[in-house]
């Protein structure tokens, strides 16, 4: 029986995603979405939630041959790193083209992850008929997403490749 360490930070339960993995999972998302669009199975456009949704949205758009791509920028975290990353109310910093969006019908909105669901909840109020897809989903945010590939526990911190830097690490033994 395991016990939780009260001194362990939540992000210490990590799930590291490589570029290869996000590519495979984003392609799997595209395959799952193929044929689900309201226009004979096709989608009118892909909208990426920046910044995390940009890479998955690019891959989904390529796989489904969707040429109309836009972004919506929503800020719901203070990104100071570590303990400074605290949730706050979500706010839209940049909206997609209104002529494309309408009420969201035929629009595929893509993000890398749904965590608390606050970001998707805000975007869903703006585009209630859009289809919301994420590569990864945590239980608290799952009600806000229509399609996702992999579920992860709420206390898991996902390390995406665009957030990681390669750096030298000392070997366990010796330095020569």
Curated annotation (Swiss-Prot):
GO terms for molecular function: guanine phosphoribosyltransferase activity; hypoxanthine phosphoribosyltransferase activity; magnesium ion binding; xanthine phosphoribosyltransferase activity. Its cofactor is Mg(2+). Pfam families: Pribosyltran. 5-phospho-alpha-D-ribose 1-diphosphate binds at residues 51-52, 88, 111-119. It is found in: Cell inner membrane. It is a peripheral membrane protein. Xanthine binds at residues 115, 158. Signal peptide: none annotated. GMP binds at residues 88, 115-119, 157-158. GO terms for cellular component: plasma membrane. Purine salvage pathway enzyme that catalyzes the transfer of the ribosyl-5-phosphate group from 5-phospho-alpha-D-ribose 1-diphosphate (PRPP) to the N9 position of the 6-oxopurines guanine and xanthine to form the corresponding ribonucleotides GMP (guanosine 5'-monophosphate) and XMP (xanthosine 5'-monophosphate), with the release of PPi. To a lesser extent, also acts on hypoxanthine. Belongs to the purine/pyrimidine phosphoribosyltransferase family. XGPT subfamily. This is Xanthine-guanine phosphoribosyltransferase. It comes from Ruegeria sp. (strain TM1040) (Silicibacter sp.). The gene is gpt.
């Amino acid at each position: 029986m395991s016990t939780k360490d009260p001194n362990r930070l939540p992000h210490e339960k990590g799930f590291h995603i490589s570029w290869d993995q996000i590519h495979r999972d984003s392609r799997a998302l595209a395959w799952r979405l193929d044929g689900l669009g309201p226009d004979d199975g096709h989608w009118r456009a892909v909208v990426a939630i920046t910044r995390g949704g940009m890479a998955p949205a690019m891959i989904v758009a390529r796989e489904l041959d969707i040429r109309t791509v836009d972004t919506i920028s929503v800020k719901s975290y203070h990104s100071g790193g570590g303990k400074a990353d605290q949730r706050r109310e979500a706010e839209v910093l940049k909206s997609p083209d209104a002529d494309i969006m309408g009420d969201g019908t035929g629009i595929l909105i893509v993000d890398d992850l749904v965590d608390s669901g606050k970001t998707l909840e805000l975007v869903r109020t703006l585009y209630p008929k859009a289809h919301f897809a994420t590569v990864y989903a945590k239980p608290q945010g799952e009600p806000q997403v229509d399609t996702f590939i992999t579920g992860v526990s709420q206390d898991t911190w996902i390390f995406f490749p665009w957030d990681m830097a390669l750096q030298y690490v000392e070997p366990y033994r010796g330095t020569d």
